Amino acid sequence: MIELEYSDVFNKTIEKLQFSKNLIKHPYNEKSLFAILVDGKSMEPLINDRAIVVADLSNKTLKNDGIYLVYYNNKMWIKRYNIEKDTFFSINPAFSHLIYKKEEIHIVAKVLLTFTNL
């Protein structure tokens, strides 16, 4: 089992997330894993608003269609990578204007898992 803490910025609490190691299908560094609560709809329907994502700070290798946590303009964003255009973009058509060139951003981590509260 893996247990991670994350900050619920909506309720101003620290929460715990427990999940089986078997859920992660990609190589990862357990000491570099962290969880973050999503605030936004730009990656819906793949990642819902207020979902919890697990990301690996040690994994910044870009792969086509990979989902990454990136830093741009003093904010953190979750975006999909397009290797042909060398850009990061939102998958929700309502946010299609959110496109960032690789040289404009800092790659923070690769998103490995998403948990959605139903």
Predicted regions and their residues:
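Short, positionally conserved secondary-structure boundary motifs
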Residues: M1-D49, N59-T61, F115-L118
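Short, compositionally biased
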Residues: D65-W77, N82-D86
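Structural motif
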Residues: A51-I52, G66
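Short Gly/Pro-enriched loop/turn and capping motifs at secondary-structure junctions
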Residues: K60, N74-M76, F95
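Short aromatic/hydrophobic contact patches that present stacked aromatics
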Residues: A35-L37, V54, L69
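Glycine- and charge-enriched low-complexity intrinsically disordered segments
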Residues: I83-L118
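Short coil-to-beta-strand transition motifs
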Residues: I47, N74-W77, E103-H106
